[in-house]
Amino acid sequence: MNFNGISASELPIYIKEQETRELSCEGCLNGEALDFDFTMAFQPLIDLSQKCTFGFEGLVRGLNNEPAHTVISQVTAQNVYKFDQSCRVKAIALAAEAKIKERLSINFMPGAVYKPNICIRTTLAAADKYGFPREQITFEVVEEEKIADTAHLQNIIDYYKEIGFKVAIDDFGSGFANLDWLAKLAPDSIKIDMSLIRGIDTSNRKTLIVKALAELCSALNIDVLAEGVETKAERDTLAELNIVKQQGYFFSPPLFETFPSVPEKKFN
């Protein structure tokens, strides 16, 4: 990802400066850290085998439900750290207010983390402030530019898992999330990118690829979720491949500041 001409390789300089200023906990918790505001929509994560919603993913939105890009377009190298921290606080606050018992999935950008033990303080403080259990939180690794320092990402993931969080790799099978991440990073779960899911019921190639990926992850004890499920045929094909954890518009679109219920018929 490029922020107003600042490449990912230059971001650590800015991130280190922002972490050093100690703006994270107090500023983000009180909503003072950013010069723009935003909120969240939530989309359910479902388990067909249990016929239940087991979690929700938080997705950024404008205050009047404007799409994510209208918010992300305001993120720069100078405020990416504070934006990442504010996303965590916002998602936790809304989840706690709704008193959800399911998992909460929060996207995070590895480039916005310099020292994991410093950056996580905001998350821990928010969980304490709002009374939301940290063991219900999953961090989804989101990256739009190739990560040169995989060891740094591994350090972040190891630390997050050590203190009780789950870690997932988002958009797996597309972009820069490659098979070597399964070996190096040992995530708790992956989310298969919608590009491999869309039309899987009519594509033998996609079916074979996703089947092989699911079997590999099963052998590595890594959970698999398919994202971008839009039709019953896609849902059923994935279920036949033993991919029972799914997400997509077939079950529910993301809803503005709401944790959607999935109709029973969507499981049948």
Regions found by a protein language model. Give the residues of each.
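Surface-exposed amphipathic alpha-helices with a cationic face
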Residues: D128, Q154-K166, K211-S218, A239
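Short acidic-capped amphipathic helix/loop micro-motif used as an active-site/signal-coupling element
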Residues: L63-E66, R88, D171, G248
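Catalytic core of bacterial c-di-GMP phosphodiesterases, primarily the EAL and HD-GYP domains
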Residues: F83-H152
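Signature for phosphate-centric chemistry
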Residues: N64, I106, D171, D193, ...
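A short, well-structured catalytic beta-strand-centered motif of the EAL phosphodiesterase domain
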Residues: F36-V71
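EAL-family c-di-GMP phosphodiesterase catalytic domain
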Residues: M1-L34, L48-C52, E143-I147, F176-N268
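Structural preference for beta-strand elements that scaffold enzyme active sites
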Residues: D37-T39, G55, R103-S105, Q136-E140, ...
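Catalytic-site-adjacent helices and loops of nucleotide signaling machinery
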Residues: S73-T76, I169-L179, R235
